[in-house]
């Protein structure tokens, strides 16, 4: 595995006038209720994790779980109370204001739920604005902005004002603006939550297309589990500032680490989450169906075909080599069973 782009070690964020004193006295054993009784609010409680280059980590939880606070700490929009945060090996908490500004300008892109477009500027002018703030010449910034317009599919609307765009189009401008500075790291805090379901689905598709092309290192905040499942390489589920579980979507659904995670995921349609590789067993040498299926297929996409087979189905890798098998009964049990572990 490559070196982490983002690394957090025992990060705490506690709000309140005596937060540091209480944290010191707690010696790492932070109880949210006890702190609240003493006038402090626990935003992030002992968060430790890494995000590698090109990975998309989706952080999710209910309102007040600490997911947005965690993101703000990692971007240092909010200072952590305690802990270590590294960006490409650089200790974020030791940077002075000038160094922090340079880091944000050159390595970080941010997109929030609020589009925050400048109403008196056109699409291309909004996208070019952060480049001009960096000191890039006007024409060069416009040229770069036009590249971003095409990237997010707004060709022909570059001279529109924000009021002339739909919500989804405005959010595309926000995404293009954040990408214009070519950030290595992309922070997104519920960027699609204000959009209606159809536009939201379109934006998720667009987002996946961009990520496949650009391979950014991403932290994405959402409270929507379906959205997390569609987008994430790994998911972190938070409750009361604590990361309850950080794992692949499949492992979170199949092997919840806590009762809270189990309840969080119990209504998730497994067929939409799991891949054939998550279910396959050792390959049978005989008695296989003629039908073959890739280990990377989402179960929902191939379940109907597998269920028409009487025998186990061969599972293949990228080179069409048989690496396992899956029986139709396994599909039935996984997709339709509601047994509780």
UniProtKB/Swiss-Prot annotation:
SMART domains: AAA (SM00382)
Annotated keywords: ATP-binding, Cell inner membrane, Cell membrane, Membrane, Nucleotide-binding, Translocase, Transport
Entry keyword S-adenosyl-L-methionine: no
Known EC number: 7.6.2.9
Positions annotated to bind ATP: 61-68
Keyword ATP-binding part of the UniProt annotation: yes
Function in brief: Part of the ABC transporter complex TmoXWV involved in trimethylamine N-oxide (TMAO) import. Responsible for energy coupling to the transport system.
Protein name: Trimethylamine N-oxide transport system ATP-binding protein TmoW
